[in-house]
Structures are given as C-alpha cells and as structure tokens.
C-alpha cells in the first residue's frame, strides 16, 4: 500500500455557510483528490445534525470511487448531557464521532468575539478546567476521536505549568479508553500558530501508545487537506508509523 493521507475533520456545512448537498460536498471531495488524499471524513458540528443529507453522501460515495469517504460528526461535549446525547444520536449510523470541548460553562472560549473572558481566569486554572472537561468527555465512552486536544491554547495564552503536567491525567484517560487523537492542522492558522496537539503532547501520546489520525478542520472546500502532508511528517518524526481510520465505529490502523 502506498502513502496514506487522510483528512478526518471536514465540515461540509462549515458554520452554516454551505449546504449539505451533493454539488457542495463534491467541491470538498475534488479538493481532497487534488491534495492526493486517500480518505476524507466529513464531520459537521452536531448542532447541524438535522441538516445532513445522507442520500447525497451515499451518492457521492458511488460517484468518487477513487477516494474513500466516511461520515462522522463533531459533537460538543457538555457534562451531564450524556444520556440525552445518546438518545439523540441513536437513530444514526456514523463511521466515527469526534468529541470536542468548545465551551467552559457557557463561555465559547475559542470564539474570537469572546476573548475578553480569559481575563477572568488564572491561566493555569483555566487549562486545568479545560483538560478536566476533556477527561470527562473521554470517560463518557461516547466518542472515537479526541478533537483538537489542546484547543485552549488557541489565542496563545500559555500556562505557567508544564502542559504535560496539566494534561497528564487526560492523556492517561485517553490511553485507557482506547480513543484516537487527531493531529489538527487548523492550529497553524490561529493566533497560537501551532498544531493541535503541540509537539510535546504528541510525543507523550506516542509514548503512551495512543493512535492518531490526521485532520484539517476545514470549514471551506479550499481548506480540505491543508497541511495534512506536513502533519504526517510531524507524526512520522515523532515515531508514528500508522494512522487510524474508521468505518461504522470500528477503527483500523493503516501504514502512515
């Protein structure tokens, strides 16, 4: 098997900027083919669940046999909502679920319009709170992939303590759960200018035997596959030789 390049975090609907229709999704797929991807995973935000057009997706799988297409969902994890989430997703068959933390309480900490909220926190306590939420998400057992593991750094507010110390119990929980961590290239285009997770966390993931997949977090067709080859090189340099892919919630590991 030749080089495997996957992009498992693609938002076909974006932030409701696109329609989940065959013509719109085809633009993403054709960009992926142009980027030499072997597999694309569409994973829109769960708030758009009712807007997903499953028939269009099945049609596109037939139309583009040269690339594997997978259908996932990125879910905003909220503590205490696990039962409701399970009931909500029960009627659907996804290939994988990404669990992500975008809110601390009601604060959307990664939204540029709400950066003033950082002033209310001690930066170490903020990181500790964030990673505690990631740990709860992991231990819920509802997800396959940890989305942008260290998203809390998005605006460049770095903790005083070692991030390995702050995230240590989270990484242990991920290891115990058998979940996969994505290397999400969107961080290179945020104020922090660093991939998620950073190199130190990725090295610890490798040491713990945590599998990885590759993701652009594209919200527009032109961003599909963006820096996926660069992320692959980073994973290879750390020591990874396999990449995780999913079908019907079952993980396989392919040569990286």
Language-model features: locations:
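An N-terminally biased module of ancient metal coordination in phosphate/nucleic-acid-related enzymes
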Residues: 1-79, 83-84, 88-95, 145, ...
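Domain-core and long-helix interface of multi-subunit machines
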Residues: 15, 51, 101-208
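Alpha-helical scaffold elements within enzyme catalytic domains, especially in hydrolases
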Residues: 31-34, 136, 173, 204, ...
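Residue-level detector of anion-binding/catalytic polar loops
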Residues: 38-39, 180, 211, 241
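Generic structural signal for residues in well-ordered beta-strands
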Residues: 69-71, 181, 243
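H/E-rich (His + Asp/Glu) clusters that bind or coordinate divalent metals
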Residues: 188-238
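Mid-to-C-terminal alpha-helical segments outside catalytic/metal-binding sites
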Residues: 226-256
């Amino acid at each position: 098997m030749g080089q495997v390049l996957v992009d498992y975090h693609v938002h076909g609907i974006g932030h409701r900027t696109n329609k989940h229709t065959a013509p719109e999704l085809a633009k993403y797929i054709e960009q992926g083919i142009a980027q030499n991807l072997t597999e694309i995973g569409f994973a829109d935000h769960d708030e758009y669940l009712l807007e997903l057009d499953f028939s269009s997706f099945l049609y596109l799988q037939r139309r583009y046999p040269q690339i594997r297409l997978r259908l996932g969902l990125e879910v905003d994890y909220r503590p205490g909502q696990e039962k409701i989430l399970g009931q909500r997703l029960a009627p659907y068959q996804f290939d994988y679920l990404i669990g992500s933390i975008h809110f601390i309480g009601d604060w959307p900490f990664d939204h540029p319009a709400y950066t003033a909220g950082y002033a209310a926190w001690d930066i170490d306590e903020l990181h500790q709170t964030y990673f505690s939420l990631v740990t709860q998400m992991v231990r819920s057992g509802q997800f396959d992939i940890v989305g942008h593991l260290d998203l809390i750094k998005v605006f460049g507010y770095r903790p005083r303590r070692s991030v390995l110390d702050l995230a240590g119990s989270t990484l242990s929980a991920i290891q115990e759960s058998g979940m996969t961590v994505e290397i999400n290239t969107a961080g290179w285009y945020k104020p922090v200018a660093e991939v998620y997770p950073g190199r130190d966390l990725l090295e610890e993931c490798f040491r713990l035997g945590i599998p990885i997949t590759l993701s652009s977090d594209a919200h527009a067709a032109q961003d599909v596959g963006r820096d996926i080859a660069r992320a692959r090189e980073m994973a290879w340099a750390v020591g990874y030789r396999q990449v995780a892919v999913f079908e019907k919630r079952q993980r396989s590991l392919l040569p990286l």
